[in-house]
Amino acid sequence: MLALRGRRGKRVRYPADGVAEADEAFVLPRPLRRGVRFLISLGAGRIRFPNHTGTVAAAAFMVATGLYGMSLGGHTQSFAQVSTTAAGFAIEDVRVSGNAQTSEIDILQQLGLDGTTSLVALDIEEARRLIGELPWVETVTVRKVYPGTIEVVLKEREAFGIWQHGSDLSLIERSGSVIAPLRDNKFASLPLFVGRDAETAAAAFYDEFSRWPEFRSRVKAFVRVAGRRWDLRLNNGVVVKLPEKDVARAMSVLAGMQDTHQLLERDIAAVDLRLEDRTTVQLTPEAVKRREVALKAREKMLKAQEKRI
């Protein structure tokens, strides 16, 4: 037999998957080769999937579709809330520190905690914002402690005085900022400032007036007049009218009259110290009547003496 021999030429290589590469006519980039081989094998039936792969894929598709729908409908937070609460992350304890005027109940109500709130789903920044809206809260720190505790650390505002504006009473800071309405006698020992703009000028005047502690203990209220000066309303009803400027001079005059004549213990209604060259003392209506009676009696006595002469 004769052996048939063809002309010797270039060898053609056949890869394992049965696809012959062209004579360097086209070569796939390396990153694409594995994917193409997978698709060819898949089409040729050499790759088989487990029996339940289709069911699992369909279920995964349905779950993904549901999550996408919840996201579009804004229900993601509700779903996370329910699922994580059921998993044992419900908020069961709220630890509050640094609070003197803010109660734990105030914080629970502000956060809307009802026993089913999830710690995982709780928005810390939103919790800080909500607690910060409480009247006494200056700063707040909120921290999650898993599995079911919130730690709240407060720094509260400090009440400096009471401000009366019209018929309303409010607690104020040194800056004059209103903290909250006055609702009980807990702060009765704080100084009372009355009038428009009194809250913003209160701290500076009160600090200056601390130079005369013997008078400060007598003051029932510091009354702001026309946004320029102060009147002192004393515990016994006497009103001391201070000048707009040079309060120290006026208080020095008042101190001298008190030491010499015990002026503030007398039956007077007001002491006017607004003018530098004079001090005016206003009597009470009862004192005025007594003075009129005394003057009339004195006139009668003088007339009687003249007749005798």
Swiss-Prot record:
Keyword Metal-binding attributed? no
Q: Where are the transmembrane segments?
A: 53-74
Keywords (alphabetical) are: Cell cycle, Cell division, Cell inner membrane, Cell membrane, Membrane, Transmembrane, Transmembrane helix
Q: Which Pfam families match?
A: FtsQ_DivIB_C, POTRA_1
Tell where it localizes.
Answer: Cell inner membrane
Which residues point to the Periplasmic side?
Answer: 75-309
Positions of the POTRA domain: 89-157
For this protein, the record's PROSITE patterns field holds:
POTRA
User: By its UniProt entry, which InterPro entries does this protein fall under?
Assistant: Cell_div_FtsQ/DivIB_C, FtsQ, FtsQ_C_sf, POTRA, POTRA_FtsQ_type
Q: Name one GO cellular component term.
A: cell division site
Output one GO BP term: cell septum assembly
Q: How does it sit in the membrane?
A: Single-pass type II membrane protein
Tell me the superkingdom of the source. Answer: Bacteria
Tell me, in a sentence or two, what this protein's role is: Essential cell division protein.
Similarity annotation: Belongs to the FtsQ/DivIB family. FtsQ subfamily.
Q: What is this protein called?
A: Cell division protein FtsQ
* Gene name of this polypeptide: ftsQ
